[in-house]
Swiss-Prot record:
A Pfam family it matches: YbjQ_1
InterPro entries: UPF0145_dom_sf, UPF0145_YbjQ-like
Family indicated by similarity: Belongs to the UPF0145 family.
Lineage: superkingdom: Bacteria
Residues forming coiled coils: none
Protein name listed in UniProt: UPF0145 protein pXO2-45/BXB0052/GBAA_pXO2_0052
UniProtKB keywords: Plasmid
Amino acid sequence: MIVTTTAEIQGKEIIEYIDIVNGEAIMGANIVRDVFASVRDVVGGRAGAYESKLKEARDIAMDEMKELAKQKGVNAIVGIDVDYAIIRAGMLMVAVSGTAVRI
């Protein structure tokens, strides 16, 4: 499956726009607290543990979105958008969305 942030796929023709697809992942308060507690492990100005948890949440959300697209019988998702939000006390949400298309 082709997944892209652009509205079109170079060299491909979009035959049909099917639906909006999305995926979400929420990191619980304890995970966020533990990650912040390990910020002392910052190397080169980056919080490795925190980045790892963000990547994990983003991957989960992307996989969920791709699975929904497969269920709709499409072979590509265009216009991908990734959003991060802090919800409630210490909970982080990663949400991805895009347009499921047939090429």
